[in-house]
């Protein structure tokens, strides 16, 4: 009798173990949350995406999330993955460092901040930065009065690397160079898909600026009045 009882208990435990094992496999198939699974470029649309996240093999990330028509949250820095959460340490704004829960469905959809994102490609080539190293003039005006010009004022963005830039406002006086002046403001930015997201070092929100280097006003967005607005 005892032998029969022990056999029944052993059989029950074996069946329970198999069931738990199958549940673990099914759970793993339904949702992936490891580092290897998140390494990619993700967008909410194939064309004209409004929400973009990118995680690279080297541990760096870029995030662009639309908050309103003229306000996008953006962040760059380093990340780590642990138990279904990706911890993002922002390069510039401490308050923008955050831990995000995420999951990847069996159909390959990334669930991030309540947004469904599609895998577009690998990060290394997806966010090619055409602005790195440029000192780009994007606006300006002449100074003077009726019938004469005393100088000019110019707006530049000096892109020092992939993440950091300086917004520069300079005044040049043709006949009085001692009055020349230049003001620099430290900025951080993300360039993606011919658009620029640019903010001062302690801010993380930006309009979505169009980038057209063939135009004199090459960084701009169109407001609700149909007007071009420069940085």
Regions found by a protein language model. Give the residues of each.
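Lipid interaction determinants
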Residues: 21-74, 85-186, 192-231
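Sec-dependent signal peptide recognition
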Residues: 2-9
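C-terminal motif of bacterial Sec signal peptides marking the signal peptidase cleavage site
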Residues: 14-17
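Short beta-strand-centered aromatic/proline hotspots
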Residues: 77-79
């Amino acid at each position: 009798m005892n032998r029969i009882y022990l056999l029944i208990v052993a059989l029950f435990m074996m069946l329970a173990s198999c069931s738990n094992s199958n549940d673990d496999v099914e759970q793993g198939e339904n949702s992936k949350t490891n580092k290897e699974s998140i390494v990619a470029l993700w967008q909410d649309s194939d064309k004209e995406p409004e929400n973009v996240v990118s995680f690279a093999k080297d541990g760096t990330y870029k995030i662009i999330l639309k908050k309103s028509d003229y306000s996008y949250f953006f962040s760059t820095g380093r990340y780590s993955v642990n138990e279904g959460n990706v911890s993002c340490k922002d390069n510039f704004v401490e308050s923008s460092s955050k831990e995000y829960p995420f999951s990847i469905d069996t159909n390959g959809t990334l669930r991030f901040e309540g947004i469904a994102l599609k895998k577009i490609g690998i990060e290394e080539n997806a966010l090619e930065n055409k602005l790195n190293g440029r000192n780009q003039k994007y606006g300006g005006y002449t100074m003077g009065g009726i019938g004469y010009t005393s100088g000019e004022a110019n707006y530049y963005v000096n892109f020092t690397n992939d993440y950091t830039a300086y917004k520069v406002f300079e005044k040049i006086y043709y006949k009085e160079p001692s009055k020349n002046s230049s003001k620099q403001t430290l900025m951080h930015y993300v360039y993606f898909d011919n658009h620029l997201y640019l903010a001062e070092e302690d801010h993380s929100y930006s309009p979505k600026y169009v980038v057209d280097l063939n135009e004199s006003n090459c960084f701009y967005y169109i407001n609700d009045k149909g007007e071009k607005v420069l940085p």
